[in-house]
Every structure is written in structure tokens, then in C-alpha cells.
């Protein structure tokens, strides 16, 4: 019985990883903490417990290019799947394209979209390119809808003070 349960869990994890869109190969065990001493291993290990996902809190990983933001985001996504959470990974550019396609979809059908109802939505590369006003509005609607319903993990190379420029120059968004 124990072997059967372990096999089922392994299949669930494997299937969930495929469905999530997470790039393969990024785990916490292969993240080079020595290369990036500014990343506190203890803080990442705390995040890896997934308590923040259980509480439907969100996370921002900010830093310059090449420091491992995406690696950490994906590794936390893998850990979330291992802990039974549903996960979807999108680069912002791809997510905005999906949101534009869904702009005229009824609210009931929109709720069925993966990016709306997973436990953890990972949005990579926010701020790589500035958003148009309509893109910023769609992004805000997504974040607003998910508030209190599910966690969002965002990676960005922009500090929070730079976000108005990313969000079509709108300080309110």
C-alpha cells in the first residue's frame, strides 16, 4: 500500500510539473548559494515550507539580471507542487498575451483559466519591457482578482520605486 501511495504521488508531481509550465532543472538543491551570498539560505528554506502559499500571500523576488531570480522562483514552484499545490509559470509577455486573448471572455469562463485559479501563479520578468496602459490594466485586474484567492510570485529586475514606469507610468496601479 505504501509503495502504491508513493507511486501515485510521484505521478501526481510529474504530471503537475508538466502542466505548470515550469522550466525544468531548477531546484533548491542545485541553486548556488555561494555564488549569490546576498540570498539568505535560511530565508529561502523558510519560503520552501510553502506556509506563505497556504496563507495566500505573495512574494516579490527583485534583483539585477543574472542573480538567479528565475531559478529560485522555479525551485519554489517545484517545492509547492511537491507539497500538493497547483502552480502555473508564465513569463509576463506570455501572460499578457493570454490576458489579451481572454479580455472578452465572460467572468465565469475566465475563472476557469489556469492563471486565475492555481494556488501559486509565478510571473517571470516583470519590468523587462514597460507595459502599455491596457496591459497594465489587465495585469492589475489579474492581481486584484487573485488577492486573497491565491499566491503570486513575481520576479523583476526593477525596484518598487521604478514600477510606475513599468505600469504605463501609472503610480496608482
Sequence positions of predicted segments:
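Acidic-residue sensor for enzyme active/binding pockets
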Residues: 2-4, 10, 82, 125, ...
